[in-house]
């Protein structure tokens, strides 16, 4: 079904009766009490848009047994959302179904990963076909899916970014990019923003500047943080700084063609270059929009000037497109294009395979040769036939279904809707983003902008889940809701999500008033 028809066939309905229980198949039971919305006060409750998909009957482990296995055998640092974690059973496009049959609108897409929809029919068909043909060879043999995919991906990047290294995850991709930068420059120092997340491997932890991911052990040698040019929470920034339909509530007197905040943050960047690194550096990592840090956007023109400063020091510029790439931002296919810059290296993962483990590093022939001189890079699973076939299918779906255009249209529609909530509720401090990458930052009040306490954000998060909406979390104090649905999302589903947020915020304000 085309996106146009899906927009027309999914009207938003509201019910004013008692709280609605999420849909459940009558024959499903795990022997545990199920989460309902009966805890919510009697407000107008948003009703989910319809879904024409029926999930299979759940026939696996009981919920309590899952909890026992998780506690006994899985990593203790792996935590799940919600007081009662969801046991998800099946997915279809923008929808998820739990083991009890309840349906949820997925507005986080597996941490900004399921780009074209859960179990997209075309991607499924390609995967099944390749599964029956060839699973694995390693790169010591050639196979068509790898070469077909490389040609398609290279065509989407500007010259001279044409040499592709296929790997399996964003952390792997960023580690390889670090090696490339150091091999090419013969320097060690790499700069990244405070609040940046570039991976959780021992090597990339040096680039990641979020306290949750820091260890009391040495690691990430040669990595230096610099101030994040955050126009909402940083010392400078105002109402004309961001490349977004929605600006901050802070005022500024900048002329349309001159951003004073950008100039101030560039001075801080120069200070880092003067005091914290050697005279010659290896490179600079930047996400076009910070993801884990809560969808932070930089002042217009900042990255362009920062790239010039880095190159003047002999460094290369790396764009981490793990969360921003493949049309998610709407106006452009790649996030770096929104800043009018051309990186020397681009890393990508997550949406590249719609959830299948896959990643890539793309660079210039010159930098690729520098790596080849010092390292015979090899990756057993990089360029796997299954991954490449799926990657090709994802690119085809994005083009055939106009998903980049949908991200622009529906994302802008959603940003403007959420901006109205910001104006309506004192605890919504900022709404920001571009396309289908949106952040909603919660504050105690708009004057101090102190982060809303975690326990209060947790309750709003729970209330959204009880009403059938799944969203992510981000920022240093986990005070920002991250909105990044699959790019097939429709306006009626956005209307539902906004009404869920309005209901959750209203209930929270009522709790505060008691």
From Swiss-Prot:
It is found in: Mitochondrion. Multifunctional aminotransferase with a broad substrate specificity. Catalyzes the conversion of glyoxylate to glycine using alanine as the amino donor. Catalyzes metabolism of not L- but the D-isomer of D-beta-aminoisobutyric acid to generate 2-methyl-3-oxopropanoate and alanine. Catalyzes the transfer of the amino group from beta-alanine to pyruvate to yield L-alanine and 3-oxopropanoate. Can metabolize NG-monomethyl-L-arginine (NMMA), asymmetric NG,NG-dimethyl-L-arginine (ADMA) and symmetric NG,N'G-dimethyl-L-arginine (SDMA). The gene is AGXT2. This is Alanine--glyoxylate aminotransferase 2, mitochondrial. Disulfide bonds: none annotated. Its EC number is 2.6.1.44, 2.6.1.40, 2.6.1.18. Homotetramer. It comes from Homo sapiens (Human). It is an enzyme of class 2 (transferase).
